[in-house]
Amino acid sequence: MSIEEILEKSGAILEGHFILSSGNHSEKYVQCARLFENPTYGEMVGNMLAKKIKKYNPDLIIGPAMGGIHIAYVTAKYLNKRNIFTERENGKMTLRRGFKIIPGEKVAIIEDVITTGKSVKEVIEIVEKMGGKICCIASIINRADENPFKYPYEYLTKIEIPIYKEDECPLCKKNIPPEKPGSRYLKK
């Protein structure tokens, strides 16, 4: 089964009016958490991503909460590598729970969907500060126009969905109320 078929069967692509984690607006939202409602789909996608990044030979797989936690874990499982995650504390991405990055360790950063790459860039900063060596970045879905990182970037599929600044959003102009599904909007 292809990644596109899995996304469709899992109901991961939502339609409506959404405010993305970046603050931009969109008519569609990819909710990759829906993939993991069915463990078979989650395992399939993690295996696909593991095959994509195996050539980088990472020592550690790290994903930002919330979206990157599941896919980073399943990818690490297939590569038999250590897995940790970052999370927000008072609005700032941090490494907690006793997680460590060993200086010199080759690190793969895994995310579910990348649009602007903002969360991943915050993880990059943490990894670099702790002396990790980033070998690659990977995601299930690429919504970016180009690679927004200075590191190799692998993904399973590219989905082009128009995004709008708030003042240019046609859905706002129609007074359609937006939803905020991204983890950046979870109550702190």
Swiss-Prot record:
Pathway: Pyrimidine metabolism; UMP biosynthesis via de novo pathway; UMP from orotate: step 1/2. GO terms for biological process: 'de novo' UMP biosynthetic process; pyrimidine nucleobase biosynthetic process. SUPFAM superfamilies: PRTase-like. NCBIfam families: pyrE_Therm. Gene3D superfamilies: 3.40.50.2020. It comes from Thermosipho melanesiensis (strain DSM 12029 / CIP 104789 / BI429). GO terms for molecular function: magnesium ion binding; orotate phosphoribosyltransferase activity. This is Orotate phosphoribosyltransferase. InterPro entries: OPRT (IPR023031), Orotate_PRibTrfase_bac (IPR006273), PRibTrfase_dom (IPR000836), PRTase-like (IPR029057). It comes from the Bacteria. 5-phospho-alpha-D-ribose 1-diphosphate binds at E111, D112, V113, I114, T115, T116, G117, K118, S119. Disulfide bonds: none annotated.
